[in-house]
């Protein structure tokens, strides 16, 4: 599936055009928000309608209302899916969410070319996702440097130990995400975070991604030494996403107490 998605991205690049010049950035610090979270563990809450493996996750999809609910519940950043074909996202969702909230916004897509980096800046993203399994270490580093040169931060995502080691041999990302889901098989286990967290330099913010759906999961990944988590599907499947965030942190009364 990953190879199929990347092939689609290469097709989309054929029609991607960018106007001149690049507007002045109005960025919100992404890594800093995760280093100083509102709770013991930072939360990147995801706005996602569908996925290739699960189909439609949230039929009544209102990205702005969802993002505002996340912010009220104490999320530290918002992740917005912009891929259309496989996740039923859209670039305008990112723009709308950025205008509606006051916390950093991450563009979640399959970025493989510098033009997508510039496009992300134009859409108002504060940070972008770079997937280690989708890029050579050389290309990932080049896109990372391109992003920072125009005021964007990056969440560098890995799943395999070998991918992490190849990246760290070149540079140390400020934020490293450990995807608990194998993008080739879609098998998900928190053991991925356990296996990789200790290999990441202490200067990096470590984010655990995917498969986090309960307060028990939150306590588990925190014990592995991560500073933040990215949670989407388990929140999006709840009718009240604001209350779902409280429950995720063991705050079942919804008033912020544990």
From Swiss-Prot:
InterPro entries: Aldolase_TIM, Indole-3-glycerol_P_synth, Indole-3-glycerol_P_synth_dom, Indole-3-GlycerolPSynthase_CS, RibuloseP-bd_barrel. PROSITE patterns: IGPS. One of its GO terms (molecular function) is phosphoribosylanthranilate isomerase activity. Keywords: Amino-acid biosynthesis, Aromatic amino acid biosynthesis, Decarboxylase, Lyase, Tryptophan biosynthesis. It is an enzyme of class 4 (lyase). Pathway: Amino-acid biosynthesis; L-tryptophan biosynthesis; L-tryptophan from chorismate: step 4/5. Pfam families: IGPS (PF00218). It catalyses: 1-(2-carboxyphenylamino)-1-deoxy-D-ribulose 5-phosphate + H(+) = (1S,2R)-1-C-(indol-3-yl)glycerol 3-phosphate + CO2 + H2O. GO terms for biological process: L-tryptophan biosynthetic process. Its EC number is 4.1.1.48. NCBIfam families: PRK00278.2-2, PRK00278.2-4. Belongs to the TrpC family. This is Indole-3-glycerol phosphate synthase. It comes from Geobacillus thermodenitrificans (strain NG80-2).
